[in-house]
């Protein structure tokens, strides 16, 4: 997926989050001081994440945390290469 396709997905994701009636803990990519991948700070209900982001299901279950609010924090990282897909796409 090239850079233009990635950029085109962002408004759709934001629209879906704005329509969602439940609480959104983080409405976008926020860089974490402990990890350079901004996707690590993205928190959303798992049903919404399944609709808007593409994950390897087993990888998501291995890297899912439940910080306080009950919604999982999903790490959008390619675990085989260790690269954040957002950065990999931007560098092409």
Swiss-Prot record:
Superkingdom, natural source: Bacteria
Protein name: Uncharacterized protein Mb0967
């Amino acid at each position: 997926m090239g850079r233009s396709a990635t950029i085109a997905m962002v408004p759709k994701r934001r629209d879906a989050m704005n329509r969602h009636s439940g609480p959104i803990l983080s409405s976008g990519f926020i860089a974490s001081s402990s990890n350079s991948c901004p996707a690590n700070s993205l928190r959303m209900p798992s049903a919404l994440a399944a609709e808007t982001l593409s994950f390897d299901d087993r990888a998501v279950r291995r890297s899912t945390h439940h910080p306080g609010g009950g919604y999982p924090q999903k790490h959008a990282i390619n675990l085989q290469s260790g690269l954040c897909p957002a950065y990999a796409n931007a560098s092409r």
